[in-house]
Amino acid sequence: MTDTPTKQEIQSKNDNVPGATPVEQKKNNRNDRKRNRRGDSKNLERDSDWQERVVQIRRVSKTVKGGKKMSFRAIVVVGNEKGQVGVGVGKAGDVIGAVRKGVSDGKKNLVRVPLTPNNSIPTLSLGRDGAANVLIRPAAPGTGVIAGGSIRTVLELAGIKNVLAKRLGSKTPLNNARAAMVALSQLRTHKSASKERGISLEQLYS
């Protein structure tokens, strides 16, 4: 039966190599710091790909037994402009906390968007959320993002450069942003659409 090492022994193994000279121990510690720094830089590069935009910040209240409890609600859109985008909502007692929660919620609800070579969408799509309807159409190169409000923010952070969007129904920023997300989630490439329908690309275009 082998003896289990104590916490002090494990810590000493992690900090210093047994039997090593002070010069070797210093070199090992330097290498560990380099590895940690390299890992931190990779995480920073990964985080720098994402952009965050606050669509709306509102002060909301909740009636409780002792009176009204005030807090802030933030609607945040996150995306990497490479075909991934998400919408999140956060509530907290301060604005910074609400935005931070909104960013975290948005990264949990990401949607992957198929992009064409000219940074448009492959097909027309209609998304609905509550009383909001959003219609998005592909556009020719040089058209730009023809949309407004929270819909424009969602499309831009998804990496779409040429698109036509129309808001139908409700003007609520949250419902419109979520309706745009539904429309983007329904998009399919021509190849995947033909595969789902069991027909060839020639039959799809005919």
Curated annotation (Swiss-Prot):
GO BP terms: translation
Region (Disordered): 1-50
Comp. bias (Basic and acidic residues): 38-50
UniProt GO molecular function: rRNA binding; structural constituent of ribosome
Segments of skewed composition (Polar residues): 1-15
InterPro entries, per the entry: Ribosomal_Su5_D2-typ_SF, Ribosomal_uS5, Ribosomal_uS5_bac-type, Ribosomal_uS5_C, Ribosomal_uS5_N, Ribosomal_uS5_N_CS, Ribsml_uS5_D2-typ_fold_subgr
Keyword entries, A-Z: Ribonucleoprotein, Ribosomal protein, RNA-binding, rRNA-binding
Record GO cellular component, one term: small ribosomal subunit
Matches recorded under HAMAP family: Ribosomal_uS5_B
Annotated function: With S4 and S12 plays an important role in translational accuracy.
This protein's domain notes: The N-terminal domain interacts with the head of the 30S subunit; the C-terminal domain interacts with the body and contacts protein S4. The interaction surface between S4 and S5 is involved in control of translational fidelity.
Subunit structure: Part of the 30S ribosomal subunit. Contacts proteins S4 and S8.
Family: Belongs to the universal ribosomal protein uS5 family.
UniProt name for this protein: Small ribosomal subunit protein uS5
Source organism (scientific name): Prochlorococcus marinus (strain MIT 9301)
Gene: rpsE
